[in-house]
């Protein structure tokens, strides 16, 4: 076990801690008035790539709630942008990218650009680690108690946006390419797999104590494609991180994977499995490798609703995992209309002894 005063890091390393540590996906976001005040200062990419702004945004929920984890403020699409794919975030539409549909499109991507392009992200992580590990309180949080998390999009989910050129509910063009031009799609996935591993190692070197892979659209794939485009790339990334930076926990989040989630947990070599809202925590925990840390999985819409129902379900999830390494989180990200007071209520509920 890890000799550390950081509860989250202890649990990510496989130790059961009571009450469990808590952090939330999208804990730094539009539901916070202090985030909205900064949002008008710069566009989204500029906020991600400006260390002063990204550091401040990352720390906002730490100051307010003393979360046990601080996750880097960035975006899963920073990687394709860093490789040279055009990217813009359009109000009301979301991300717009220059779609990858041919060998010529793929050839324009240059993974060698990534270290220089993402240098501001690494500077943000370095600053955050110094602040979090320093002696001074960070608002409501004690210095030396908060774990710094890096992250990336998993290759399939990032490929969805790169091929489609925008967000979608089904990503038909992406899934179609995987069937109709498997060689091209495999080359894209291979490029993303190596670039993702390299970027996560760089994040670790810059200060991240654990990293998370978000595979938000993995649930779109049937089992054979899931094994090929979700499990295999994730396993390769985890193996690369373990070989280059042994002992650093990797959290996997195969959203909406359903019955494939257990196979994903067994076959990827991950230390931590994040479960989405649809998973029965206790039942799924019984299908996972012994001692594997579980993260999740309160419904974000129940957090939005708040009140006794939220508190009751939060206690039920927490109590069902007692005695097992468990990180309390949501089953997806905080939704923008969530009252900040509800997040505070949740944190207090989870930390009840």
From Swiss-Prot:
Catalytic class of the enzyme: lyase
Signal sequence interval, chain numbering: none
Site positions for Transition state stabilizer: 75
Localization: Cytoplasm
GO cellular component terms given for this protein: cytosol
UniProt keyword list: Cytoplasm, Decarboxylase, Lyase, Porphyrin biosynthesis
GO molecular function: uroporphyrinogen decarboxylase activity
Primary location group: cytoplasm
SUPFAM superfamilies: UROD/MetE-like
EC number of this enzyme: 4.1.1.37
Binding sites annotated in the UniProt record for substrate: 26-30, 75, 161, 216, 332
Keyword DNA damage in annotation: no
GO biological process: protoporphyrinogen IX biosynthetic process from glutamate
Cross-referenced Pfam families: URO-D (PF01208)
Pathway annotation from the record: Porphyrin-containing compound metabolism; protoporphyrin-IX biosynthesis; coproporphyrinogen-III from 5-aminolevulinate: step 4/4
Record carries keyword tRNA-binding: no
Family: Belongs to the uroporphyrinogen decarboxylase family.
Stated role: Catalyzes the decarboxylation of four acetate groups of uroporphyrinogen-III to yield coproporphyrinogen-III.
Record note on quaternary structure: Homodimer.
Protein name (database record): Uroporphyrinogen decarboxylase
């Amino acid at each position: 076990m890890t000799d550390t005063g950081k509860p989250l890091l202890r649990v990510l390393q496989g130790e059961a801690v009571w009450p469990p540590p808590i952090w939330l996906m999208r804990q730094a976001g539009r539901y916070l008035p202090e985030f909205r005040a900064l949002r008008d200062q710069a566009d989204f990419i500029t906020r991600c790539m400006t260390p002063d702004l990204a550091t401040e945004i990352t720390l906002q929920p730490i100051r307010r709630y003393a979360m046990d984890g601080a996750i880097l403020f960035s975006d899963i699409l920073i990687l394709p942008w860093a490789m040279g794919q055009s990217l813009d975030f359009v109000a009301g539409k979301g991300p717009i990218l220059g779609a990858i549909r041919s060998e010529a499109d793929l050839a324009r991507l240059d993974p060698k650009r990534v270290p220089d392009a993402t240098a501001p992200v690494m500077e943000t992580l370095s600053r955050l680690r110094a602040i979090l590990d320093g002696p001074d309180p960070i608002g409501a949080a004690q210095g030396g108690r908060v774990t710094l998390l890096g992250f990336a999009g998993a290759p399939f989910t990032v490929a969805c946006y790169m091929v489609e050129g925008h967000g979608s509910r089904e990503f038909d063009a992406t899934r179609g390419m995987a069937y109709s031009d498997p060689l091209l799609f495999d080359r894209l996935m291979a490029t993303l797999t190596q670039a993702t591993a390299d970027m996560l190692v760089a994040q670790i070197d810059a200060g991240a104590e654990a990293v998370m892979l978000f595979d938000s659209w993995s649930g779109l794939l049937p089992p054979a494609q899931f094994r090929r485009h979700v499990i295999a790339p994730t396993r390769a990334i985890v193996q690369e991180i373990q070989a280059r930076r042994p002992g650093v926990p990797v959290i996997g989040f195969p959203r909406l994977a359903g019955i494939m989630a257990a196979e994903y947990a067994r076959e990827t070599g991950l230390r931590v499995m994040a479960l989405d809202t649809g998973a029965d925590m206790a039942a799924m925990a019984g299908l996972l490798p012994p001692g594997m840390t579980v993260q999740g999985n309160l419904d974000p819409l129940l957090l939005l609703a708040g009140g006794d129902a939220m508190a009751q379900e939060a206690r039920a999830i927490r109590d069902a995992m007692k005695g097992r390494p468990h990180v309390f989180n949501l089953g997806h990200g905080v939704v923008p209309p969530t009252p900040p007071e509800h997040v505070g209520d949740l944190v207090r509920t989870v930390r009840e002894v």
